[in-house]
């Protein structure tokens, strides 16, 4: 009986440690980490720290596709699918981030 209780306890502990309530991948790639750093350093002044929520000035961008992210960063123009939170809000183009677009996409695609 003690042996069965011990095995049940082990299985229960294994199941609990296997649960992941996070929206981030269990294994974060370097690209994911770079994207997270860039987002939390440069984007949260307008977007929310949680990309699924609207920010102070800008809408949520969770799960945005690569082309949309690229276009917004390179031109700053609003596109179908992401509407400005304020009618006159404009995003400044950030062409210096061109090489980091894949990193931002890697991070944002985890928030769907």
Where are these regions (language model features)?
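Axial heme c-ligation environment in periplasmic c-type cytochrome domains
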Residues: 54-62, 77-111
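Electrostatic cytochrome c docking/interface patches
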Residues: 19-38, 54-57
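Sequence context surrounding c-type heme c attachment/ligation sites in exported
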Residues: 33-40, 62-67
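A mature extracytoplasmic/lumenal domain signature
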Residues: 50-51, 65
């Amino acid at each position: 009986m003690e042996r069965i209780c011990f095995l049940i306890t082990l299985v229960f502990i294994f199941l609990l440690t296997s649960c992941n309530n996070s929206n981030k991948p269990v294994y974060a790639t370097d690209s994911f980490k770079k994207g997270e750093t860039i987002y939390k350093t440069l984007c949260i002044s307008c977007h929310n720290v949680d990309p699924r929520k609207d920010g102070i000035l800008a809408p949520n961008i969770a799960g945005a596709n690569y082309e949309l992210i690229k276009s917004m960063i390179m031109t700053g123009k609003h596109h179908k699918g992401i509407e400005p939170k304020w009618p006159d809000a404009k995003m400044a183009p950030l062409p210096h981030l061109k090489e980091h677009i894949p990193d931002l996409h890697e991070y944002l695609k985890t928030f769907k």
